[in-house]
From Swiss-Prot:
InterPro entries: SUN1-5, SUN1_N, Sun_CC2, SUN_dom. One of its GO terms (biological process) is meiotic attachment of telomere to nuclear envelope. The modification Phosphoserine is found at S48, S100, S138, S344. The gene is SUN1. This is SUN domain-containing protein 1. It comes from Homo sapiens (Human). It is found in: Nucleus inner membrane. Residues 1-138 are annotated as: LMNA-binding. As a component of the LINC (LInker of Nucleoskeleton and Cytoskeleton) complex involved in the connection between the nuclear lamina and the cytoskeleton. The nucleocytoplasmic interactions established by the LINC complex play an important role in the transmission of mechanical forces across the nuclear envelope and in nuclear movement and positioning. Required for interkinetic nuclear migration (INM) and essential for nucleokinesis and centrosome-nucleus coupling during radial neuronal migration in the cerebral cortex and during glial migration.
């Protein structure tokens, strides 16, 4: 079908139903033309407002309103695709048309109302001419329907809403139609004076009223349209949900990513909003609120102070009522004119614009005014009474003075001149009374002081007599004791003389003993001295301590020789071996039995941890190492375990080796350098008596020397593990050329303090530059009871 003739089409001017729109063959109301434009992607032929089917129905209804009939038909018989496209286009244009109609509707309503109130139609004509020439009667009908649907009319006036003010000859309708459409049809020209004019104005001005169509069926139609739109929206939502579910089933990864993307956007917007609110509240609102509170707090305090002063005083500060105008000045001379409020005025409500004033507040003000008026009336009555009393007083004064002066002058003199002489006499008498009263008080005080002095003297005499009586027997007792001391002293003198005689006897005995010793031991040397005798005894005899030391050394030497024999021969020592060990030890001239006894004692000592004393630092006995206060362990570079040439475990010993009994070469604790620390917790609290430091002998060393052995060391006693500097128990030196096990005696202390933590501090070694080795450290002493 060819639609090219649409471009040359001109709308008819006399069609009764023509409203100025080119909808007969345009794409807005022809499905064939719409399909043609959609197929060839052409723009609409006429760029004019497009009316919906609802507007056409409204136009038809408005034209037939004079006959009293409403005709509405829905002629939707197009295909589904054309309906959707046409609905989309008409919806957009209907929105723009409704907006313009809504704005123009307000202008026309204002102009019409002003024209009716003044009784003319000039404003109506101006409003009509202001409307765009593109709009026609359909615009009026659409406007009426829109106003009725959105509630722009006065819905309360239901009767007036259905009325139409039309002149008998229909001039208004014709003129309005001509003014709106720009042309006049044949039907409308019958009611007008001019028939062949395209643009006509009303012949005679007159009051014009708008025509409203309030058909109740339109509400049902609009409700149906709303339900249809809601259904379409629900269908779209369900379709979207179904597509989302289908996407989740078909491509769950994409759906999940989309969901997370939307959630991320929502969460980002939410966090942004919260941060913005936080910044806004803290930086702007908080500061403004603080300023507002700073300004508001003094106002609250002022209002509180005013309210505390009284409700009446508070209302007196309000500028609503001028209380100063209600009061007038009172005169004492005219007490009859006291203020009497007229309650009739207060009880009358305000007229006109003052009806909005709060009447309940005015009632409270009236009550306060009434109470104030009552008080003023009461004060007026009191003033009247005072005035009458003053007049009576003036009359009496006039009678007493005989009329010499006026009443006012006599009263003024009586009030203004005080009786000075009378006051002076009264003051003098009062002064004399006070002086006499003070004299009486002084006399009483004097009497009391004399009585107190007498009592003190009596008490003093009584005290002296009582003390004298008590001291007499005490003095007598002391005299007796003094006599006894004198007698004892005399007896002690005799004892002293006896002691002197005893000393003399002892000296005599010593002299005699010396002489006898000389006679016994130095017969050949009669002239020898006692010192020579002592030197002789010391050369032939030894002391007990030296003997014990020599025996201990002998046992150790024998034990070392026996141990060496056992380690070499791998057999038990025979008698010949024991004798040779004893002879090597330097003990010659002894029998085999004596040698066996010495060996047995040496073996017994060896079985007793080589010392025969309890080791309180032994780990198996309860001792332990405080590793947190020990020096750093020296790590050897020899790997005990490796994988593909990669060392996995290096050999190293912990400080626990020092308090364990196993001693063999290499089984020691080594620390870096020549200075180190070792802290040992003993098994119990003891009084330290001796310390033993053991190292391997040179004969067992692979290098033949023991340069890694400690040299100078000291032992300290600690009260707790957190004490930095303890009490010195002894400072010693280990001899590398001496025995492998060397014992050192602790220093004697006067307080004899007990300790459970001992610190071994090494100051130097015997020359090794890299490390120092400790094999065994023992602590001996007496446990605390």
């Amino acid at each position: 079908m060819d639609f090219s003739r649409l471009h040359m089409y001109s709308p008819p001017q006399c069609v009764p139903e023509n409203t100025g729109y080119t909808y007969a063959l345009s794409s807005s109301y022809s499905s064939d033309a719409l399909d043609f434009e959609t197929e060839h992607k052409l723009d609409p032929v006429f760029d004019s407002p497009r009316m919906s089917r609802r507007s056409l129905r409204l136009a038809t209804t408005a034209c037939t309103l004079g006959d009293g009939e409403a005709v509405g038909a829905d002629s939707g018989t197009s295909s589904a695709v054309s309906l959707k496209n046409r609905a989309a286009r008409t919806t957009k244009q209907r929105r723009s048309t409704n907006k313009s109609a809504f704005s123009i509707n307000h202008v026309s309503r204002q102009v019409t109302s002003s024209g009716v109130s003044h009784g003319g139609t000039v404003s109506l004509q101006d409003a009509v001419t202001r409307r765009p020439p593109v709009l026609d009667e359909s615009w009026i009908r659409e406007q009426t329907t829109v106003d009725h649907f959105w509630g722009l009319d006065d819905d309360g006036d239901l009767k007036g809403g259905n009325k139409a003010a039309i002149q008998g000859n229909g001039d208004v309708g014709a003129a309005a139609a001509t003014a709106h459409n720009g042309f006049s049809c044949s039907n409308c020209s019958m009611l007008s004076e001019r028939k062949d004019v395209l643009t006509a104005h009303p012949a005679a001005p007159g009051p014009v009223s708008r025509v409203y169509s309030r058909d109740r069926n339109q509400k049902c139609y609009f409700l149906l349209q709303i339900l249809r739109r809601i259904g379409a929206v629900g269908q779209a939502v369900s379709r979207t949900a179904w597509s989302a579910l289908w996407l989740a089933v078909v491509a769950p990864g994409k759906a999940a990513s989309g969901v997370f993307w939307w959630l991320g956007i929502g969460w980002y917007q939410f966090v942004t909003l919260i941060s913005w609110l936080n910044v806004f509240l803290l930086t702007r609102c908080l500061r403004n609120i603080c300023k507002f509170l700073v300004l508001l707090i003094p106002l609250f305090l002022l209002l509180a102070g005013l309210s505390l002063r009284g409700q009446g005083n508070f209302f007196s500060f309000l500028p609503v009522l001028n209380w100063a105008s209600m009061h007038r000045t009172q005169r004492v001379d005219d007490p009859q004119d006291v203020f009497k409020p007229t309650t009739s005025r207060l009880k009358q409500p305000l007229q006109g614009d003052s009806e909005a004033f709060p009447w309940h507040w005015m009632s409270g003000v009236e009550q306060q005014v009434a109470s104030l008026s009552g008080q003023c009336h009461h004060h007026g009555e009191n003033l009247r009474e005072l005035t009458t009393l003053l007049q009576k007083l003036q009359a009496r004064v006039d009678q007493m003075e005989g009329g010499a002066a006026g009443p006012s002058a006599s009263v003024r003199d009586a009030v203004g001149q005080p009786p000075r002489e009378t006051d002076f006499m009264a003051f003098h008498q009062e002064h004399e009374v006070r002086m006499s009263h003070l004299e009486d008080i002084l006399g009483k005080l004097r009497e009391k002081s004399e009585a107190i002095q007498k009592e003190l003297e009596q008490t003093k005499q009584k005290t002296i007599s009582a003390v004298g009586e008590q001291l007499l027997p005490t003095v007598e007792h002391l005299q007796l004791e003094l006599d006894q001391l004198k007698s004892e002293l005399s007896s002690w003198r005799h004892v002293k003389t006896g002691c002197e005689t005893v000393d003399a006897v002892q000296e005599r005995v010593d002299v005699q003993v010396r002489e006898m010793v000389k006679l016994l031991f130095s017969e050949d040397q009669q002239g020898g001295s006692l010192e020579q005798l002592l030197q002789r005894f010391s050369s032939q005899f030894v002391s007990k301590g030296d003997l014990q030391t020599m025996l201990r050394d002998l046992q150790l030497q024998i034990l070392r020789n026996v141990t060496h024999h056992v380690s070499v021969t791998k057999q038990l020592p025979t008698s010949e071996a024991v004798v040779s060990a004893v002879s090597e030890a330097g003990a010659s001239g002894i029998t085999e039995a004596q040698a066996r006894a010495i060996v047995n004692s040496a073996l017994k000592l060896y079985s007793q941890d080589k010392t025969g004393m309890v080791d309180f630092a032994l780990e198996s006995g309860g001792g332990s190492i405080l590793s947190t206060r020990c020096s750093e362990t020296y790590e050897t570079k020899t790997a005990l375990m490796s994988l593909f040439g990669i060392p996995l475990w290096y050999f190293s010993q912990s400080p626990r080796v020092v308090i364990q009994p196993d001693i063999y070469p290499g089984n020691c604790w080594a620390f870096k350098g020549s200075q180190g620390y070792l802290v040992v917790r003993l098994s119990m609290m003891i009084h330290p008596a001796a310390f033993t430091l053991e190292h391997i002998p040179k004969t067992l060393s692979p290098t033949g020397n023991i340069s890694s052995a400690p040299k100078d060391f000291a032992v300290y006693g600690l009260e707790n593990e957190y004490q930095e500097e303890g009490q010195l128990l002894g400072q010693f030196t280990y001899d590398q050329d001496g025995e492998s096990l060397q014992m050192f005696q602790a220093l004697k202390r006067p307080d004899d303090t007990a300790f459970q933590i001992v610190e071994l501090r090494i100051f130097s070694n015997w020359g090794h530059p890299e490390y120092t080795c400790l094999y065994r450290f023992r602590v001996h002493g007496e446990p605390v009871k």
